[in-house]
Amino acid sequence: MKEIKKISLPIEKIEEPTPRNPAKKWIFSSIITIIFLIIMGFLAYHSLNTIILNYVDVETEKKIFGQVLDNKNSHRLAVENFATIKNHPTGQKLITDMDRVMVSDDDIENAYASLGGHITITKKLLQNAKTEEEILFILGHERAHIYNRDVISGLAKSIPITLVTEILGWNKNLLNPEQLILSKISREAEEKADIGGKKLLLDLGLNTACADRFFKNHASNFEKYTEFIASHPDTNLRLENLLKDNPNPEKSCTEFDYQDFLENISEK
């Protein structure tokens, strides 16, 4: 009877993953995938933003989105009736720039710019406003968002950021990278928009201190103001920037009474 010999076949032993020996290939491929997605998101972020800024100017944006997103149920704010504007030599240019200021019925103090060059201000904000300067600062702030391309550019930037965080599941974390990135972008845009609001007052030769009510009230009653402040810089810092380098501190404020202004709100 022949002796049976044991033959060792050259079969590679599969190394099972353990806590001390993780699946190295899986970890490596996951890291590569994450890096690839982040790079693609970064490229898409800059590409979309560059295309929009170079090929879609403000007037083109108004033509494309102005009528589509127009709210027929809202009312136009007759900016041309502001005493501080109609009596100013360059007021007509401001009236033209603000021909899309709409009044909404929302019961909260708020204002925002939207696609198509629209600016919306709530009836509640107008009811509580004390001076024309206050309203003009806010309108100038939102006008700056439009001309700085913050609305349409912000939309383009948010798409790749949202897609990458959704795919990677990072949007479910307590420290959501998407929210952190978009909040930083928003705060930077708000700082520049505040400069635009202040510049509007200075161009009209007005006292910037007359526009401080909104910030002062917000500082003492945070709960009342949500959307306009949510992703904005520190309120006290914004107030400080509004008041400093004021060339017209002695100029009296222009009183604003919403009840007297009702007749100046007309249907679009």
Language model segments and positions:
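A Zn2+-metalloprotease active-site environment signal
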Residues: 2-268
